[in-house]
């Protein structure tokens, strides 16, 4: 098992996508990258904690690699917009990769260079060592699956999930049930 901690805008979006990725064991929304201990959602929304909305992904690296996790990451959000994803604005929505070891750091640096070359734009994704993860409040967990008809879910999250499924059909987890 390996862990990845990533922020690509609203954590409801990234959680919804990664829950559907083959090889992903669990996805938890939360806060990381800042300086205030034990922040709440309300604290993070003040733009003063330094934390970003992130997801902590536990995955089976024999099924999906960290590089593949990042390939999906760079497709499901815009890594060229600073402190913003769509209409979600603030440092809590910044693009961030919190690496857990040197191998993850090297892969992330390589991926950032590749994405910049491919799209011809500067990637503003922050890259820093992982320190601590604060799990989000219960009502943020599985938000998309619990509220599919919520306007934000329909207009913002659903297109990201569909984009993932279209671009990475071989990575889609077969839904049981």
Curated annotation (Swiss-Prot):
Keywords: Oxidoreductase. The active site is at residue 10. GO terms for molecular function: L-methionine:thioredoxin-disulfide S-oxidoreductase activity; peptide-methionine (S)-S-oxide reductase activity. It catalyses: L-methionyl-[protein] + [thioredoxin]-disulfide + H2O = L-methionyl-(S)-S-oxide-[protein] + [thioredoxin]-dithiol; [thioredoxin]-disulfide + L-methionine + H2O = L-methionine (S)-S-oxide + [thioredoxin]-dithiol. It holds the Pfam family PMSR. The keyword Iron-sulfur does not apply. Its EC number is 1.8.4.11. One of its GO terms (biological process) is protein modification process. Has an important function as a repair enzyme for proteins that have been inactivated by oxidation. Catalyzes the reversible oxidation-reduction of methionine sulfoxide in proteins to methionine. Belongs to the MsrA Met sulfoxide reductase family. This is Peptide methionine sulfoxide reductase MsrA. The gene is msrA.
